[in-house]
Structure formats: structure tokens, C-alpha cells
């Protein structure tokens, strides 16, 4: 996984996406960091509290809204867990594009 190409693809995509705001970007960057720590292997198990802390999102409603938006817009695949002992699963969608020189 080339994280430079992935992030370049992400920023190219959000530049044309009117539905994405800074909170979505912050959340995506936090999820990207978890994916990085997981050696870029899908799925990534996440904890709401940890992701909220890293992304600096203080409202659970905002967190869930942005997570569902990222899923609906095709940036991630989100599989919620309703078990407090088992984290939710996030699959990071490949956004890497060939970089034009």
C-alpha cells in the first residue's frame, strides 16, 4: 500500500465533494491512522472513544453522522458492532490513483 497515493487520491476526491466538511476529514485521518497501525490491512477494529479522541470530535451524534456519511459516500465500509466488548469494523476503500507527473 502506497499511503502517499492513497492520501493524494483522498484529497483529490474530497476537493470535488460538497458533502465533506472538516469534521469528516478529521475523522477520516483518524481512521487512516488506525489503518496505518494495522499495517494497512482491512478490516480495522475501532473503538468509538479512541477514534473520537484522535479526531477531536466531542459529540457522539456528530461522530456517528460523519462515520455514516463516509460510508454512504464510499470512502469507507463501516460495520457497526452493538457489542461493547467487540469494536466496530472499518474497511478502508482504496482511493489511490496513479499520480500524473
Regions picked out by a protein language model, each given a short descriptive name:
Residues 1-54, 72, 101:
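Short recognition helix of helix-turn-helix/winged-helix DNA-binding domains
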Residues 35-97:
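Winged helix-turn-helix DNA-binding recognition segment
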Amino acid at each position: 500500500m502506497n499511503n502517499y497515493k492513497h492520501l493524494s487520491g483522498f484529497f483529490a476526491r474530497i476537493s470535488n465533494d460538497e458533502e465533506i466538511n472538516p469534521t469528516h476529514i478529521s475523522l477520516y485521518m483518524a481512521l487512516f491512522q488506525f489503518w496505518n497501525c494495522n499495517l494497512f490491512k482491512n478490516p480495522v477494529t475501532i473503538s468509538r472513544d479512541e477514534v473520537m479522541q484522535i479526531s477531536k470530535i466531542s459529540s457522539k451524534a456528530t461522530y456517528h453522522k460523519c462515520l455514516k456519511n463516509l460510508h454512504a459516500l464510499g470512502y469507507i465500509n463501516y460495520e457497526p458492532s452493538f457489542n461493547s466488548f467487540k469494536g466496530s469494523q472499518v474497511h478502508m476503500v482504496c482511493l489511490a490513483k496513479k499520480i500524473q507527473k
